Amino acid sequence: MARFQMSNLVGDPFALATVSIAILAWIITVVSCIIAQTKEAIPNFFWWSVAYQFCIVVGITAVMGSNTGHVYSTAIVGYAAAGLVCTTFTIDGLVTSKEGARQSGGAGLILLAMTDIVWIFYFGSTPQSRPRTYIDSFAPHKEQPSYRSSKPISHSYTPRPETTVSSAHQPHLYSSAPLSGFESSPMAGYNATTASSTGIQPMVGLQTNASTVGGDTAEIGQPTEYPYRAKAIYSYEANPDDANEISFTKHEILEVSDVSGRWWQAKKSTGETGIAPSNYLILL
């Protein structure tokens, strides 16, 4: 489980700014509502909105401090949207009052609502979106987990299966000595034209042809053209068990040949080629 680190907040200008504004706005709201409560009772719904916003601020602070926004982004968007609705209804009952304490509380809730809107936009956007990429570029520590915590879904290409003869079905091969006088005799029922079209070979020459079939299973040729250029928005460590993957660092520029799948065939500036996850890259 990821641990909370203060450096994640201090090193991220976006997190530091939004969390600081939200905490300050919540304190202003609470103090103003307490002062207003001494003069005139405040509806219970107002206090519920303030308490709910407190939970949102604490939760998002913990998420940003532990750098797990990519894990809880969906939950954050839902909770922040509900908090925005509650805060909006509460604002109307405070800012329309002629009492200064209530108006101050309404101003604090307006700041909280604006912060909720910013959080909804940020956590509701994908990492590939330009605004979020720009915001995350100021926080070098924001790295998504590598292959160890993510399961590859599909590859842009798959190698063809090897055509090999199973050891359980190996035919009996005979020496040429017992076949003396029959080397040039065609096999009964054997048609050379049919064999060439179907790939079926006589048993006598099976050993040589089997080695030929094995030799045909060469590696699939790599693409020769890379018309696209992509920038890495996160660092990625290749899976050592998969020779097709390549590693790259944040902000590294890669050349890409195909962008149709979730795994792209890419080429590094060093000439190294392989597949890279598309959610770690953004097209230029």
From Swiss-Prot:
Keywords: Cell membrane, Membrane, SH3 domain, Stress response, Transmembrane, Transmembrane helix. GO terms for cellular component: plasma membrane. It comes from the Eukaryota. It is found in: Cell membrane. The chain crosses the membrane at residues 15-35, 45-65, 75-95, 104-124. SUPFAM superfamilies: SH3-domain. Residues 138-170 are annotated as: Disordered. Residues 1-14, 66-74, 125-284 are cytoplasmic. Residues 225-284 form the SH3 domain. It is a multi-pass membrane protein. Residues 36-44, 96-103 are extracellular. Belongs to the SHO1 family. Plasma membrane osmosensor that activates the high osmolarity glycerol (HOG) MAPK signaling pathway in response to high osmolarity. This is High osmolarity signaling protein SHO1. The gene is SHO1.
